[in-house]
Amino acid sequence: MLFRSRFVFAFGCNDIGSTTQDPMLIRWSDQEDAGMWTPSATNQAGSIRLSHGSEIVTAIQTRQEILTFTDSSVYSLQYLGPPYVWGSQLVGDNISIVGENAAAIASGVVYWMGKDKFYKYDGRTQTLRCDLRQYVFNDINADQYQQVYAGSNEGFNEVWWFYCSASSLENDRYVIYNYVEDIWYYGTIGRTAWLDSGTLSNPIGATYANTIVNHEYEIG
């Protein structure tokens, strides 16, 4: 991961002098030098090991921090400057995330799918009230959690999650949270990836047929 302040991060990596991968270790390069990973008094390369959980699952950038998910907790990584450079703070414990693509950021807030509920982080970790909780989690293929894909649709104040229903090996359903109106809706569609509009005219989604599809697109 490349952070905005021009550090490169490696999650779940080997320590210096070791070839053994540590699933809870985070390392970062020197600022402005992606090739320098050995800490010294003259650079800002370094590392930190998280303590809650057994492996790092994923991480997502916000404006001020890197939200990092282990298999049982959530950490906030923030830039402190020398000599510590980066520090970690536990912001949620006994909290799950189903896969590395199950979190998305919308309007500065991070939303994600856990193994039995949905969450958000806006400076503090909260459980989302979800009218569709039983509909989603009673009919989801837990063996295919890694296929879950979250994406924002900020033009409509939405966060989408694409997932496999219990009898499917491919994403065939979606659930949407409208964070302004605080309502949920659902449907059936297969998407493997998602990119919000940003500089594009419309958000786009990828399919299992290796095609890119425009969404929120009016014809005529």
PLM regions with names:
Residues 22-34, 173-181:
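Beta-propeller blade signature
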Residues 26, 37, 56-57:
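A broad "ordered helical/assembly scaffold" signature
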